[in-house]
Amino acid sequence: MSGVKYEVAKFNGDNGFSTWQRRMRDLLIQQGLHKVLDVDSKKPDTMKAEDWADLDERAASAIRLHLSDDVVNNIIDEDTARGIWTRLESLYMSKTLTNKLYLKKQLYALHMSEGTNFLSHLNVFNGLITQLANLGVKIEEEDKAILLLNSLPSSYDNLATTILHGKTTIELKDVTSALLLNEKMRKKPENQGQALITEGRGRSYQRSSNNYGRSGARGKSKNRSKSRVRNCYNCNQPGHFKRDCPNPRKGKGETSGQKNDDNTAAMVQNNDNVVLFINEEEECMHLSGPESEWVVDTAASHHATPVRDLFCRYVAGDFGTVKMGNTSYSKIAGIGDICIKTNVGCTLVLKDVRHVPDLRMNLISGIALDRDGYESYFANQKWRLTKGSLVIAKGVARGTLYRTNAEICQGELNAAQDEISVDLWHKRMGHMSEKGLQILAKKSLISYAKGTTVKPCDYCLFGKQHRVSFQTSSERKLNILDLVYSDVCGPMEIESMGGNKYFVTFIDDASRKLWVYILKTKDQVFQVFQKFHALVERETGRKLKRLRSDNGGEYTSREFEEYCSSHGIRHEKTVPGTPQHNGVAERMNRTIVEKVRSMLRMAKLPKSFWGEAVQTACYLINRSPSVPLAFEIPERVWTNKEVSYSHLKVFGCRAFAHVPKEQRTKLDDKSIPCIFIGYGDEEFGYRLWDPVKKKVIRSRDVVFRESEVRTAADMSEKVKNGIIPNFVTIPSTSNNPTSAESTTDEVSEQGEQPGEVIEQGEQLDEGVEEVEHPTQGEEQHQPLRRSERPRVESRRYPSTEYVLISDDREPESLKEVLSHPEKNQLMKAMQEEMESLQKNGTYKLVELPKGKRPLKCKWVFKLKKDGDCKLVRYKARLVVKGFEQKKGIDFDEIFSPVVKMTSIRTILSLAASLDLEVEQLDVKTAFLHGDLEEEIYMEQPEGFEVAGKKHMVCKLNKSLYGLKQAPRQWYMKFDSFMKSQTYLKTYSDPCVYFKRFSENNFIILLLYVDDMLIVGKDKGLIAKLKGDLSKSFDMKDLGPAQQILGMKIVRERTSRKLWLSQEKYIERVLERFNMKNAKPVSTPLAGHLKLSKKMCPTTVEEKGNMAKVPYSSAVGSLMYAMVCTRPDIAHAVGVVSRFLENPGKEHWEAVKWILRYLRGTTGDCLCFGGSDPILKGYTDADMAGDIDNRKSSTGYLFTFSGGAISWQSKLQKCVALSTTEAEYIAATETGKEMIWLKRFLQELGLHQKEYVVYCDSQSAIDLSKNSMYHARTKHIDVRYHWIREMVDDESLKVLKISTNENPADMLTKVVPRNKFELCKELVGMHSN
């Protein structure tokens, strides 16, 4: 080893000190001189002082010899090795904030230019990372990886997409290895032959050799030989162009194909559709049989095959020609679909495949797959096809082509396939007749063994046996929408899952296409007809001419007739007693009911599933041959498009739905057992019933057991009885039943008809109903308005599944009260309200003066519950419709304060610490006590009009609920009363009243509209105040406070502790958004959720999908919990609130993450007491935490008597240029809150020696005391220097605290679980 010489370059003072220092230390280690460099190094006892001094001199000499002259001059006065080493570190590795900021800026701004050597760029990147690490700056592995990828030029975008695909986390070593491998491959010589090339409109383009990224990443270089020799397009000879060719011009059909050095043969359709190019001589000879091997080409616009037998659906015809490399032409003999089973076991349906007999291989088009929603990835000589998170197929590169193996099968939508028999098709098609199945088979729409017949089906007899009908002739209209038949069927003996009892049909005479709307009551027919009318006219562009129906009251209303007349629709009503005139609709009702009866019987499902069965039956009828159409398919006649049958399944069979990995853990089941009950909004999608969770789910990744049906044990007793807890059931109010089955013998033979179903939900507001799912096959037409109830799951986001929750619904009108189960109690509440109005002299009946207008009024009902969600009171209130008021006439000032939530927590914490009494009161009809200053008239209350005086109006003497000035008038009345009792109103909070009787005896009153809290030590004085209040106002004494504004109050007087909890509220929120059974998480926001505006939807489709997600409602619900008792979610709620205007899928995932956190911490509450009532403040900031505008976050938190009383987490209004500035701004905001709390407590007679705000930034603390760092702080807005004045006059102090002990840290950023739990403990949050 002694003979080895080590070289270390001299350090010249430029960048790279960290690398030089590392190498220099290694050199000293090799020479045995490193011991003198350590800070705590001491001379060993066994070594002489002379030897130690010699060792130090040799080390110092070695260091100086490896420094340039300029650097040596800077350390000339240092004699020892340790002194030189330390001086160099202070000069060239400064750990100041400025040096850190400089290196960070270099790292974040680092960008590799096109053509730059990647290894050089990687060395610079790693050098910056190392220097920052030496300065104590820790950068997470994921951040390092993302920074490296972001520093690469745009030519690396596809590679970056491939590296990040399917990963939730990534490390720098993964990115580095992939990039180094890519660098090696870039240096390989380019392939001379190109795999597949595209040609269109006489021009061909060569695909780029870069196979990284998705299929869309193709080069656009024109297809030319590597050499620049070009042949004439006319005679195919070199040396001249076509325009100069001496030979006669060839005709269009005789043009020679250009033959380049790659031996490429072109296939081009005459209609300019791009197909593909293949290397004919080299590649085709190496392929196995076309049934087993396929070639993948991302430049082809259509799939192609030479084998006719592969098609499961085929249409022969003249679809153009294909030009081959030998100048011959081959026709496209037909187009159809091919179903293949890929090498990973999935079923893939290739649509619109071109049949070209002269081809030598099967070809898969990447563009066609992309149009169908699949994604192709090419990397490392491998190909992978995915859809969502599911891998569909894989392939490898052999030669210059990507190939994959597949087997031919009958397409079944990614589902397990049994041997298809005629009996199975009979069940799939909803018990279709054998004749209908034969017609579909002749049309090659379905397939089964020839010569087989349908076995006798008992379920058909149970559901469809009827008398033989008389034959009548029927003349069908030639044009669609010339005539539409309609009829109502019902009521059913049991309500559907959605609470419906009727359905109405609309049938187009020309196409025999059917629409069915499921209803709660028959009076909804007019509304669904309006929807139907708008739907079909917009879809077809034609006008509806005639409507034929019976004389039912639902069709003969005045509004129905006026609507038809205004739109030019001739409404034909049948003669009473002659249903034959509307035989098409009558027969259709029978067909639907027969199918439903047979399907439910075979599936062994309860009758409450009749709505789902109707939907499925109509979906199948849409695709069944119709006798009046000469056995044509109504759906095809209506849309003029082919109909697919490959995805059909047996209604009620067992099914196993795949659970996405985002909704399960590694050990959870990957599928859930369900019952198949219908088809979704798209062709490839299913509706399934989950008998465990009692809800309907949608999925496209399903495995079916069509030979198995559910047993009675699969369903709960509630489902058997038709009661589905996930849906609100509203009883029908119609008393006019319609026959569920026509008993008429002489009806036109309609056959099985097509259908669409839109199921009607519960009534939300007067005249507004919720419309559920239309099942119309491939094309869906959603209702033209948005619903006002929580939406059903977005089709794109299965994780946002929502169904209605059964709950006690409050009546919204007097009409609903009369049919409400609690009618008597609600009527009693109304009577009590009227008596209170009369007792208070609220109004008197007068004649309406000329020029005046009366305001309208309505009844509002409330079923009040306690903290445990138990019904405790029925409340009815007469409310004026104040939105009709006009400013300057009916009102002037309207502002009215309410007590601050911070004041409530402060007073409750004081009560816990001093063991004070806390009593609660409620003012009955509080707003009725306010005196009006304006002259206002109102109509008489509904249900309480005075006989003989109905023309008179109410002149208001007192204010009423609903009036814009009512809150203000009540507050002024109450404030006047408190002043008369010599109570003082605090300036800090005008809804807090205080009166001191002696040094230790006082009363504090908090007012929140009509709710009051009284806090004091003397029960006698409290009782006196209650009595005085009861004399002036109608009060309700609630005794010791147990709940205020939804917060449950629990006290333990012996230990002087008080808890505030919102457990029941949070449980209701979780139930409302279907997260009650979600998997809990440990923190309210995960580190991988980097939310940005770039995640917001940009297309109309994406915005439409997100419009179905209750994002705003969920965030609003979370915000109320945060404001009251949950400071632990303040930061998370603040982040998701930034995207309320246009939320995206990732933002919704973050909201659900917060709900999952609440799911595991439902019982967490704030604890006060157990310590002295001392006010403490904590502040923190997160530098540039907002990804979009790089603004910093401010977080502050105040504790009093051991619990948090005030907190805030929000973005700063300006961009901070340093962490010092961000912390300084946060300290100023915290100081403002501290001064307010200080003043508030002092007004209550509470003083403490000093008021301290704790900050973990020493530089911000220094800046608050002195005007330091002028060059770096001179730009800070003067308003933020307010805190210096407060510190100078000793109004507050700013002191240092360790970051590990600062609870405000959780209000500005995502912190690890252990730190998060510590923060919660420091602010008094405990589990219940």
Curated annotation (Swiss-Prot):
Spell out the protein name for this chain.
Retrovirus-related Pol polyprotein from transposon TNT 1-94
Per the database record, which ranges form the Integrase catalytic domain? 473-642
* Positions of the UniProt region annotated as Disordered: 189-265, 729-800
Comp. bias (Basic and acidic residues): 241-253, 770-798
Q: Name one Pfam family in it.
A: Pol_BBD
Ranges of compositional bias, category Basic residues: 217-229
Matches recorded under InterPro entries: DNA/RNA_pol_sf (IPR043502), GAG-pre-integrase_dom (IPR025724), Integrase_cat-core (IPR001584), PolX-like_BBD (IPR054722), Retrotran_Ty1/copia-like (IPR039537), RNaseH-like_sf (IPR012337), RNaseH_sf (IPR036397), RVT_2 (IPR013103)
Please list the reactions this protein catalyses: DNA(n) + a 2'-deoxyribonucleoside 5'-triphosphate = DNA(n+1) + diphosphate
Q: What is its EC number?
A: 3.4.23.-, 2.7.7.49
Q: Which PROSITE patterns match?
A: INTEGRASE, ZF_CCHC
Extent of Polar residues compositional bias: 729-742
Out of the domains of life, which is the source? Eukaryota
Q: Which residues form the active site?
A: D297 (for protease activity)
Which GO-annotated molecular functions does the record name? aspartic-type endopeptidase activity; endonuclease activity; nucleic acid binding; RNA-directed DNA polymerase activity; zinc ion binding
Q: Which UniProt keywords apply?
A: Aspartyl protease, Endonuclease, Hydrolase, Metal-binding, Nuclease, Nucleotidyltransferase, Protease, RNA-directed DNA polymerase, Transferase, Transposable element, Zinc, Zinc-finger
Zinc finger, CCHC-type: residue spans? 230-247
